[in-house]
Amino acid sequence: MRQSIEELMEHAQNTLLAEGVIPADAKLGGIKVERPKDKSHGDFSINTAMVLAKQARMKPRDLAQRLVDALPSGQGVVSRCEIAGPGFINFFVTPERLRGVVADVLQRGGSYGQGNVGAGQKVLVEFVSANPTGPMHVGHGRGAVTGDVLARILECAGYAVQREYYLNDAGVQVQVLGRSVMLRYRQLFGDAVEVAEGCYPGDYVVDIARALKEKDQDKWLEVARAEPDEYPREMLEFAMQQVLTWIKADLARLNIRFDHWFSEFSLHSEGRIEHALEVLSQKGCLYEGVLEPPKGKKSEAWASRPQLLFKATDFGDEVDRALRKSDGSYTYFAADVAYHLNKAERGFERLVNIWGADHGGYVRRVQAALGALTGKQNLLDVVLIQMVNLTRGGEPVKMSKRAGTFVTLEEVVEATSSDAVRFWFLSRGSGAQLDFDLDLAVAKNNDNPVYYVQYAHARICSIWDKAQHEGVALQAQGWSGVDLSPLGEGAEWDLIRKLDLFPDVVEGAAVHQEPHRIPYYLLDLAAAFHTFYNSHRIMDVDAGTRDARLVLILAVKQVIANGLELLGVQQPRSM
């Protein structure tokens, strides 16, 4: 319905433009159609008159009246308009148009909620990107679910989406994995070596070492004893593949897939870092220099060495950034620069990264580098994911023996379910820390949000099954012949208005990259349905009212199903 209101107001604006009431060069930015919280203010409210009043040299309320007078009649959408406050125009939608929402939902079925705000724009969503050095933890899981659901929402809103996992297979952390596995490998042959400080604890390292021994026997033993801090790349590749197998299994449990797995090592081996630096050099964005000590670091503890620096401050960053150290090695940031240039060179028009909150300090520098490399601002958006606190019985959940320092994602999924994990990880905005109650996540009561929403879907299925059992001739496929005019009570209007809101929620979640808007909406819709069900009879009423209400709740079921599908959560027929 919002689109219909926008079209009506656009017609009125064009009429006043043609009459010269609104100047031809009027700036239309800032005009918003909103849904008033107070029902007495109508179904929609628009601020056009207040935005254009000064440009039209009129009082806002006077311009509002001219706009109302210029609205086309006979559209069957608006029953009346009211001018309120300083110049808002409030629209009251006709009952017929409201009932038409139910038909629209059922006609469009699984496509209801889809839009085209993305207009086919090519978007790359990079998420998870956990180091291949150990099992995934719940923080990784929250980022995985957020990225996957955001990708689904963007697709629903008309974007052409690709999903990518950046495999950090060339950094310091994989070097630590190599040393950790090599020590455990030696222990399996009876060498009395201790796990050095800084190496990875946890039984999973022993599992990798055992698999390595089974595969290669003592092939690496001589090398390991001769060079305790060294390891062959072949051995490291094997260790990373073992971890990657676990990571892919964890993602499969959550039904998360990727279109691309991009190797950081390839940036080095294929000369992509040198290419990125050459592009920056050609644009005059590099220089040899010495950085000042970071804030809070004493100057005497800071080694000032000449490095190759990027003029990040010219592109909105706080300080210039090092790309190549004085010893000739590249910084981690250099690989980030090369990777993001590669994304742009692949033709993506918008980049979205899902990062842990601890990477927040990297956002501005990567955005600055992309701006310098491409000449485009706002190419990269970053969604930061805060921590997850696990509790059971009101107490924090202790660390995993297998991981050594944290609870693995696999353990959480096995203790609850994929549905629970996916819904709960989106039960708060990504910028807020999340408390995940493992007991509540499996509870079959209304305090468990995923159960509450799924139960609404299952309850509607049960009502329809009962109707069929009692001989009601109405079929789900035959709803179009049902007279919806009996719908008109307050709770029915509330449900219909919430159904109409769903496409706007999807669009807002896509534009603002806030996937948690979907579960928030579903909880609200489920609450409205449960309230309606508890206060209204559906079966034990006259046939006309019964059939209209059956069709109404069928539309509710469809929208709940569409929302749960966006979340990657099942839509059970019974519970």
Swiss-Prot record:
GO terms for molecular function: arginine-tRNA ligase activity; ATP binding. One of its GO terms (biological process) is arginyl-tRNA aminoacylation. Its EC number is 6.1.1.19. It catalyses: tRNA(Arg) + L-arginine + ATP = L-arginyl-tRNA(Arg) + AMP + diphosphate. It is an enzyme of class 6 (ligase). Keywords: Aminoacyl-tRNA synthetase, ATP-binding, Cytoplasm, Ligase, Nucleotide-binding, Protein biosynthesis. A motif ('HIGH' region) lies at residues 130-140. InterPro entries: aa-tRNA-synth_I_CS, Arg-tRNA-ligase, Arg-tRNA-synth_N, Arg-tRNA-synth_N_sf, ArgRS_core, DALR_anticod-bd, Rossmann-like_a/b/a_fold, tRNAsynth_Ia_anticodon-bd. The keyword Ribosomal protein does not apply. GO terms for cellular component: cytoplasm. The keyword ATP-binding applies. It is found in: Cytoplasm. It holds the Pfam family DALR_1. Belongs to the class-I aminoacyl-tRNA synthetase family. NCBIfam families: argS (TIGR00456). Monomer. This is Arginine--tRNA ligase. The gene is argS.
